[in-house]
């Protein structure tokens, strides 16, 4: 059994790195949101969702504790968490889809992000181009990402928490299209 583990681990690592692709895979998608749209107050929403929007497009260096505290504060609301890095081309490809879905579900699903394996400056520069209507938790050592299960080095990854705050599913790799992402939101973010 142990003899199989090392080759399988190596094979999985190769596939995980390949998932990040090249610039030809995703091009350079346009943002669906301006900075003003992404950071506009979320009026009429629950206090928890309004608080998430107050931190929109910010990189929060609060560690695992800050992230877990936010998840606990959102109990009663399903949460979608996308793990990304500025150098990951498939992450860039998914950003417009995540922008759309976050706005579409802004009153019933919380969205958060985890930026890992990257510098804080690189994450902030990336967000100037593709702003998010929710915060990114800085995770340089992938400690937050470890809680998603699976390989910490897999980018992108999208984790789904149900309204009780339990992690119910993590999708590793890029979504095929926005419809596949939307289907997982409907299936798991309850």
What are these regions (language model features)?
Residues 55-79:
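A short beta-strand-turn-helix
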Residues 126-133, 139-189:
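Thiol/disulfide oxidoreductase modules built on the thioredoxin-like
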Residues 92-130, 140-147:
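Structural microenvironment flanking redox-active thiols in thiol-disulfide oxidoreductases
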Residues 86-93, 156-157:
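C-type cytochrome heme c attachment motif
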Residues 78-79, 109, 156:
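Alpha/beta-hydrolase fold active-site loops
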Residues 81, 112-114, 159:
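Conserved hydrophobic packing residues within short motifs/helices of P-loop NTPase cores
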Residues 77-79, 84-87:
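Short pre-active-site segment immediately N-terminal to redox-active cysteine/selenocysteine motifs
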Residues 1-61, 190:
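N-terminal targeting signals for export/organelle localization
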């Amino acid at each position: 059994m142990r003899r199989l583990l090392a080759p399988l681990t190596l094979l999985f690592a190769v596939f995980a790195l390949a998932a990040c692709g090249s610039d030809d895979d995703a091009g350079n998608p346009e943002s669906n949101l301006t900075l003003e749209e992404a950071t506009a107050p979320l009026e009429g929403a629950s206090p928890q969702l309004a608080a998430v929007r107050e931190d929109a497009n910010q990189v929060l260096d609060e560690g695992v504790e800050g992230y877990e505290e936010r998840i606990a504060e959102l109990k009663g609301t399903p949460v979608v968490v996308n793990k990304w890095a500025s150098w990951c081309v498939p992450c860039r490809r998914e950003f417009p889809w995540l922008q759309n879905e976050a706005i579409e579900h802004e009153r019933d699903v919380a969205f958060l992000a985890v930026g890992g394996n990257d510098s804080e400056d690189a994450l902030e520069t990336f967000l100037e181009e593709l702003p998010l209507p929710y915060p990114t938790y800085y995770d340089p050592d992938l400690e937050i990402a470890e809680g998603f299960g699976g390989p910490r080095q897999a980018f992108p990854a999208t984790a789904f928490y149900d309204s009780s705050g339990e992690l119910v599913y993590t999708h590793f790799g890029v979504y095929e299209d926005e419809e596949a992402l939307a289907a997982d939101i409907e299936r798991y973010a309850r």
